[in-house]
Regions:
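N-terminal localization/anchoring segments of enzymes in phospholipid and broader phosphate metabolism
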Residues: 1-405
Length: 405
């Protein structure tokens, strides 16, 4: 008896992009888990958002490129890239709705524990004075508004940055509205500002709302008396383009491709869904963004990856306690790691062991005259990476440094 033939057809396989979205949705399940401390649940939302940003910049960007190849795309992917792209956008939209509902639920739960996220309309007199002082001392000099004029295009926006699109209007209707775009400096300031609070309550506000409250000061040169602001976020194609120039080294091609990353085509434009249509049309025209599936209407606040840095306020039980990392007993406390690692293998288990061990090893290697080269594989880097600083120092000391990302 012959065994039945089993044919592997494309419909038996789930596209990896769709599978990845299901993987990332596990973070939403963690955020819904009542056994997880409340502030940790918020941080899971931040991790979800950060992962999704990178997914759109790389995987969705690649799908768009493949969709533009037509039938030739089947050389690189089993499924029709247009169909996969449609499936991805539908699933992302479904998860986006789940995410927003979960965020609102967690904000309510924070309130039940005496932690309140308030906007610029809810500041009391003491908080308003604090916000004004904080704005002028800390925030004002970091703002660089760009006026949107009738002629000319806007300069390229910074990838993954968040902006306030501002409309200046005259309540008496005597002057035409004016428009501006202004970046929110979350690269140097915490997105969350802790306000003066009473009793055992804790009031926090978004940095965005601190800026909204002070828009009259920012645009004091203009006679308009009404200021409306809507958040937008821009994600660009971050896939690497490698030229086929065999006369050039792979390193040179990678370097040039990374430099071009900031000028990629838009793959996602997230905007406040309450923005007036005429204002949205103006932005799309000036930024040369088509009205297609890359447009994503959202809520008042974007860039929720900042939730990973939500302040630990309130009772200690609302966040997991920090566990101090311990030193490895087989590594010396006075340095000379290069000699130590020549002995039996040392297993470091993070985050339980201190990452300082790795930094110490790299810093020693950067200085040791016997070290000629350093090769290292890195998966993810901090914004201000001590690892990168150590590797740069090694380069300055004449070492050859190779990093695989």
């Amino acid at each position: 008896m012959t065994e039945p033939r089993f044919e592997l057809t494309d419909d038996l396989f789930t596209p990896k992009e769709v599978s990845w979205l299901a993987f990332n949705e596990r973070l939403l399940q963690e955020a819904e888990d009542l056994s997880v401390p409340l502030i940790d649940r918020l941080k899971f939302l931040g991790i979800y958002s950060s992962n999704l940003d990178e997914f759109f910049r790389v995987r969705v960007a690649t799908l768009r490129r493949l969709a533009g190849l037509g039938f030739r795309s089947r050389e690189f992917i089993r499924h029709d890239p247009k169909q996969v792209l449609d499936q991805v956008m539908r699933e992302a939209k479904r998860q986006h709705a789940r995410y927003n509902a979960l965020y609102e639920q967690l904000i309510v739960e924070l309130g039940e524990h005496g932690i309140h996220m308030i906007d610029e309309l809810a500041y009391d007199e003491q908080q308003a004075s604090f916000v004004e002082a904080y704005f002028h001392k800390i925030v004002r000099h970091r703002l660089h508004p760009i006026m949107i004029r009738g002629r000319g295009d806007l300069p390229p926006l910074v990838d993954q940055a968040i902006y306030l699109a501002v409309r200046l209007s005259d309540s008496r209707g005597k002057r035409k509205p004016r428009y501006a775009l202004m970046g929110i400096p979350t690269d140097v300031l915490n997105r969350f500002v802790v306000l003066p609070s009473r009793n055992e309550e804790h009031d926090l506000t978004y940095l965005d709302d601190v800026i909204r409250y002070n828009l009259g000061s920012v645009f004091s040169l203009f006679p308009h008396d009404t200021h409306d602001a809507y958040m937008v976020k821009f994600a660009k194609d971050a896939e690497l383009d490698l030229d086929d120039d065999i006369q050039e080294s792979y390193f040179s091609r990678i370097s040039r491709s990374i430099k071009r990353r900031g000028f990629g085509s838009p793959v996602r434009f997230l905007y406040d869904g309450s923005m007036p249509d005429d204002m949205l049309d103006l932005l799309l025209t000036k930024l040369k963004i088509p009205r297609d599936e890359s447009l994503t209407p959202g809520a008042r606040y974007h860039h929720r990856s900042d939730l990973m840095n939500f302040p630990t306020v309130g009772k200690g039980s609302l966040a997991s306690p920090e566990r101090p990392a311990v030193a490895h007993p087989d590594l010396p406390t006075d340095g000379n790691y290069l000699r130590a690692v020549r002995r039996p293998d040392v297993l470091l288990h993070f985050p339980y062991h201190s990452f300082d061990h790795v930094l110490t090893l790299l810093r020693e290697a950067a200085l040791d005259p016997k070290v000629r080269s350093i090769q290292i594989c890195l998966y993810r880097l901090a914004r201000n990476s001590s690892v990168v600083n150590a590797l740069i120092n090694a380069l300055r000391n004449g070492k050859q440094v190779t990093v695989i990302m």
